[in-house]
């Protein structure tokens, strides 16, 4: 891939062959049967699709950190915007936190919220500040 991801949006399951697809799945006995599809676009306007384990919640891209976060019912995924590689993930099963919304501040940091808490995420998922 090695082109900078410039857009990321949640889409419905694409037709087979419509996009080059990449599966982001974590082996876990508690995984749901749901999937989320994210359409990515790079700086050359090339579109491809990522398939993520769990029902769709939200996606956000930070050009400051060159990271995309994908929140599903099962995981919070962190994708590197240059390589398209999964760099970190957080299992919802471990924390019992079901994220509902995700956005990026004007300063390029992520804000993520569940039903009760708001967190500020910097460069990595581990770099979180609770409010």
Outline where the language-model segments fall:
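Surface-exposed loop/turn elements that mediate protein-protein interactions on large endomembrane-trafficking
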Residues: 35-51, 76-94, 116-131
């Amino acid at each position: 891939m090695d082109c900078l991801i410039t857009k990321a949006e949640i889409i419905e399951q694409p037709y087979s062959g419509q996009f080059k697809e990449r599966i982001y799945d974590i082996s876990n006995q508690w995984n749901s049967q749901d999937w989320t599809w994210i359409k990515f676009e790079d700086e050359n306007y090339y579109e491809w699709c990522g398939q993520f384990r769990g029902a769709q919640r939200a996606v956000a891209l930070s050009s400051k950190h060159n990271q995309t976060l994908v929140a599903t019912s099962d995981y919070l995924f962190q994708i590197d915007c240059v390589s398209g590689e999964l760099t970190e993930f957080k299992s919802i099963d471990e924390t019992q936190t079901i994220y509902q919304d995700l956005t990026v501040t004007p300063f390029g940091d992520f804000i993520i919220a569940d039903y009760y808490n708001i967190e500020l995420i910097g460069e990595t998922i581990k770099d979180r500040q609770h409010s």
